[in-house]
Design a protein with these regions (language model features):
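N-terminal beta-strand motif that seeds the catalytic metal site of vicinal oxygen chelate
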Residues: 7-31, 41-48, 52-53, 103-108, ...
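Short, P/G- and charge-enriched loop/turn segments at secondary-structure junctions
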Residues: 8, 54-59, 92-96
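Residue-level preference for beta-strand/loop junctions
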Residues: 14-16, 62-64, 100-102, 139
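Core segments of cupin and vicinal oxygen chelate
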Residues: 23-78, 138-140
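Vicinal oxygen chelate
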Residues: 24-29, 44-46, 78-79, 85-154
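Active-site beta-strand termini and strand-to-loop segments that position acidic
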Residues: 70-75, 147-150, 160
Length: 171
């Protein structure tokens, strides 16, 4: 267990967000995508798992999982991670949509939304919608786009900046 666990005042229970899991058709390819395009880093936590304990955990007979944990950009070595795994036997997924119930997307803050979207597309991903810009309180401007990784998982790219105020000149 990492050193940044949270304990609520008066409650003797530990809580800490640890990872998000993606089940991939081709874990090696998807791991390479997240490393090269979205700057996730290997922390040398590869997995090749099987056994009765895994069968019990998953409810699957003969389960076999391979994959890797990747450190998400912007975090120290003490997690959270993106866990990309593949099972020997996969069940086909319903295509992801932004308004589907359940976990909908993984969001990344980037410097250049349009440039990162171009990298995603070049690496086999796709765009879901269009790049949009909107204003938030406190003079914040946000740029957003939804995209899909090469296996169809939805990503949100976002960039935030302080809006430039127009100068007022009195002539």
């Amino acid at each position: 267990m990492g050193g940044n666990a949270h304990r609520r005042k008066g409650v003797d229970k530990m809580f800490r967000y640890v990872h998000t899991n993606i089940i991939a058709k081709d874990a090696s390819r998807l791991i390479a995508f997240y490393k090269s395009v979205l700057h996730c880093e290997s922390i040398n936590e590869t997995r090749d798992l099987s056994g009765k304990w895994l069968d019990g955990l998953t409810g699957l007979n003969g389960a076999h999982i391979t994959g890797e944990h990747l450190l998400l950009p912007g975090y120290g070595k003490d997690h959270p991670t993106l866990e990309i795994f593949s099972y020997d036997t996969l069940k086909e997924a319903v295509p992801a949509e932004v308004n589907r119930c359940g976990i909908a997307h993984i969001a990344f803050e980037v410097d250049d939304v349009e440039g990162t979207l171009a990298e995603i597309i070049e690496a086999g991903g796709s765009s879901v919608g269009e790049v949009v810009t909107t204003l938030y309180p406190n003079d914040l401007e946000a740029v957003f786009v939804y995209a899909k990784d090469p296996e169809g998982n939805i990503l949100e790219l976002q960039s935030w900046r302080t809006r430039k105020k127009a100068s007022s000149c009195n002539l």
